Amino acid sequence: AKERLQMRALSGPKLADKPADPIIVHPDVRRMLLTAKALTEGARALALHGSSLLDVIARSDDAAARQHADELLSFLTPIIKGCLTEWAVEASNHALQCFGGHGYIRESGMEQIARDARITTIYEGTTGIQALDLLGRKTLQTQGMGLKHFLTMIVAFCTEQTQNPQMVEFIAPLAKSAQDWQQLTLEIGKRAGQNPEEIGAASVDYLFYSGYIVLAYWWARSVAAAEASSQPDAFKKAKRETARFYFQRLLPRTQSHAAAILSGAGNLMALEAEAF
């Protein structure tokens, strides 16, 4: 994206001595690159958290800490398996798109990454299976035990950062997302008690809804950690701006997932099988 010259920036030429500007000056290319960057870096933070919980389970001398880590990891596992693999597909598709037609041939290596990412949503349980595991077994059957653990983490972090002026723009939407997550889960549970099909109808949207909030938490923590570190200003800015993009452009996806969940199972089950 920094090397390929194509068209001129809408605001005027950036490289007047060249026949065109690099495609990274175009907003839509930035959208694709930032989406891939935000999902990938956030996913790494979540995956490392999962690994740290495994260490606690295997190594801690504190029985209560081991149990807490096990309950939390049990809840997060389908999110890690389901969301991270789907986001890998999205990120690799955006990267391939930035290459244009050249990305579709073997020379760039991008097509291999796209194919490798795609299979991850199938093996080790498809996305639909991970979603059912999250909503059915790990949330409703446990009365939301793992969810409560994670919500407690969010509340504690938001409370800790309330007076930090660098975190204001992230804390308010994160705290609201936590409240909405709890209320939506209760509503699904109520509906499932009346119609078990609601679990299957809501599960995939609930998986992504949960995943985006989990990643919002890790992006907020990443910004707080970066700002408190001795890293160069350029590093801190990159974290802050990527987090801002995530909160303003990707976290709002939860709203469409919530709307789909609340529309109910009827629109999925009404059509006769013969019509497909």
Regions found by a protein language model. Give the residues of each.
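Long, well-ordered alpha-helical segments
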Residues: 1-19, 39-61, 84-102, 138-165, ...
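Short, charged/polar, low-complexity loop and linker segments
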Residues: 16-25, 62-69, 187-199
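Short beta-alpha connecting loops at secondary-structure transitions
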Residues: 18-20, 28-34, 64-80, 112-121, ...
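DHp/HisKA dimerization-phosphoacceptor four-helix bundle of two-component histidine kinases
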Residues: 31, 35-38, 79-82, 176, ...
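Residue-level signal for the membrane-embedded core of alpha-helical transmembrane segments
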Residues: 41-44, 83, 126, 130, ...
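Alpha-helix capping/hinge segments and adjacent helical runs
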Residues: 49, 71-149, 245-270, 274
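C-terminal amphipathic alpha-helical interaction region
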Residues: 141, 157-276
